[in-house]
């Protein structure tokens, strides 16, 4: 029976085998299924006999281990009269999000004057089993029974509590799955199957209003007894407007039309076009702008007054920039302000024509400067070697002797003359005291150079071996105006 029902059934919101869909994906909260409702119990003549109350709400379930879990709490109760005898029923069930039963307790009673009757049933899930406990009391006699079903064989089981929620889901969807077949328990606590069928729509009068109802019929097919069928007239929001038990003269019906709740339609947020802000025309914004502008101006002026060196640095830079007018202003600025950096290495004394980039790292710049110094030393060594081999001689004509000037060597004028006069004043150097010397004029420097002859011969026609060589690159010797008298004694 169970496998057959599971194979043939199709579940809406329950896990009932192939083709099933879990209710957790249907959005119970979006359907607004949590609300109470009350119906009046009427006899076949329309007289009130009692009332039926149904409520579905969120709750918490505490298991045997003391663990609390969220659940759906279904509570229904009725109380009325049957043939002038008090009767009633109650239902309390706990369901998980898949409408699977966790615990359920139901009770029915009829207080007949002679033999009162009471029937109780408890369904409890323990481990992987569903334990059904049933007791029937008729007068003083009580019968009890316990049935155990494995949970793996109860896929698609619809309890009385799950039936209440499932009907509200069908009302929201205004449809019933075709061939909907589920497992259920009959009045004797035995496992059977139930079916749901749509009977279409019908308009009924509720007070002064008319409403269209969606009719669903549930039938419990018991193996030992006749089928038990109920018809449910449902409003579009899930409210139960009428309940009719097939074969019973009475019914349950609402006496007042409830406020039909519709699913909230989330409207997109309004979009507002951005208007251009012309702050110059806004008096408040323009006033704030002027105040802030004046505040910044005073702050800048105060800072420059406290730090005059800043204005001096900028003025110097602009002056050098306008004087040199470089093509690359950024590089020029980096070279100008580079020496002010605290981590910059000192500038070398000798620089090549290839200036290092101011944006290179310090290590690269130091390596480049070392290479440049080595190249400069090599170039100076080569120039000194060439100067010794090739000495450009400037010939100065005289009567008998020549004065050679080496233009490659750099000797300061005052240093040369000091050494010259020092030698001249030393009397031991010269054997001949009667040495006549003349002054000659050298252009640009206005210096007098006296040439002397310290040889032992008396012949003036013989050239002296000791000639004076004057090294000066910046001295221009005029051969036409210089008269050198050698050995005029």
Swiss-Prot record:
Keyword vocabulary terms for this entry: Cell membrane, Cilium biogenesis/degradation, Cytoplasm, Cytoskeleton, Membrane, Nucleus
Q: Which GO terms describe its cellular component?
A: actin cytoskeleton; cytoplasm; nucleus; plasma membrane
Tissue specificity field:
Expressed in testis and ovary. Strongly expressed in pachytene spermatocytes and round spermatids compared to spermatogonia and somatic cells. Expressed in Leydig cells (at protein level).
What does the entry give for GO biological process?
A: actin filament polymerization; cilium organization
Indicate where this protein resides in the cell: Nucleus; Cytoplasm; Cell membrane; Cytoplasm, Cytoskeleton
In terms of domain of life, where is this protein from?
Eukaryota
- Region spans: Disordered: 350-412, 438-489
> Which residue ranges have biased composition labelled Acidic residues?
363-412
Assembly and binders: Interacts with TTC17.
> Which family does the record assign?
Belongs to the CATIP family.
Q: What does this protein do?
A: Plays a role in primary ciliogenesis by modulating actin polymerization.
Record protein name field: Ciliogenesis-associated TTC17-interacting protein
Organism of derivation? Rattus norvegicus (Rat)
């Amino acid at each position: 029976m169970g496998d057959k029902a599971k194979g043939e059934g199709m579940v809406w919101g329950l896990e009932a085998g192939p083709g099933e869909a879990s209710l957790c994906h249907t959005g119970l909260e979006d359907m607004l299924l949590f609300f109470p409702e009350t119906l009046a119990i009427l006899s076949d003549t329309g007289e009130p006999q009692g009332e039926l109350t149904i409520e579905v709400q969120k709750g918490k379930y505490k298991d045997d281990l003391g663990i609390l879990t969220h659940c759906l709490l279904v509570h229904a109760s009725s109380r009325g009269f049957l043939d002038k005898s008090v009767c009633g029923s109650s239902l309390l069930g706990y369901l998980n999000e898949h409408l699977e039963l966790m615990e359920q307790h139901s009770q029915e009673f009829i207080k007949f004057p002679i033999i009162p009757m009471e029937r109780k049933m408890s369904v409890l899930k323990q481990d992987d089993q569903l334990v059904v406990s049933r007791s029937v009391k008729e007068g003083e006699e009580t019968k009890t029974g316990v049935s155990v079903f494995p949970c793996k064989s109860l896929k698609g089981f619809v309890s009385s509590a799950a039936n209440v929620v499932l009907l509200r889901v069908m009302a929201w969807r205004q449809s019933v799955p075709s061939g909907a077949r589920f497992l259920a328990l009959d009045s004797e606590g035995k496992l059977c199957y139930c079916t749901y069928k749509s009977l279409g729509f019908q308009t009924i009068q509720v007070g002064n209003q008319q409403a269209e109802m969606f009719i669903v019929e549930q039938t419990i097919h018991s193996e030992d007894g006749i089928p038990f069928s109920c018809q449910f007239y449902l409003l579009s929001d899930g409210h139960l407007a009428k309940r009719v038990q097939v074969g019973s003269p009475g019914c349950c019906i609402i006496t007042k039309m409830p406020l039909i709740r519709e699913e909230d339609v989330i409207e997109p947020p309004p979009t507002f076009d951005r208007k251009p802000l012309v702050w110059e025309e806004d008096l408040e914004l323009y006033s704030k702008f002027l105040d802030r502008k004046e505040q910044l101006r005073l702050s800048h002026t105060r800072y420059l007054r406290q730090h005059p060196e800043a204005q001096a640095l900028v003025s110097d830079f602009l002056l050098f920039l306008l004087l040199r007018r470089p093509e690359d202003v950024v590089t020029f600025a980096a070279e100008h302000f580079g020496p002010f950096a605290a981590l910059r290495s000192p500038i070398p004394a000798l620089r090549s024509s290839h200036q290092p980039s101011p944006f290179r790292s310090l290590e690269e710049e130091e390596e480049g400067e070392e290479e440049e110094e080595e190249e400069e030393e090599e170039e100076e060594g080569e120039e000194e070697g060439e100067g010794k081999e090739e000495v450009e001689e400037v010939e100065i004509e005289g009567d008998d002797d020549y004065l050679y000037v080496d233009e490659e060597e750099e000797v300061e004028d005052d240093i040369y003359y000091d050494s010259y006069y020092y030698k001249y004043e030393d009397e031991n150097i010269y054997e001949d005291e009667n040495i006549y010397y003349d002054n000659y004029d050298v252009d640009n420097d206005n210096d007098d150079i006296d040439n002397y002859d310290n040889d032992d011969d008396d012949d003036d026609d013989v050239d002296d071996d000791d000639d004076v060589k004057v090294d000066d690159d910046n001295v221009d010797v005029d051969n036409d105006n210089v008269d050198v008298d050698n050995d005029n004694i």
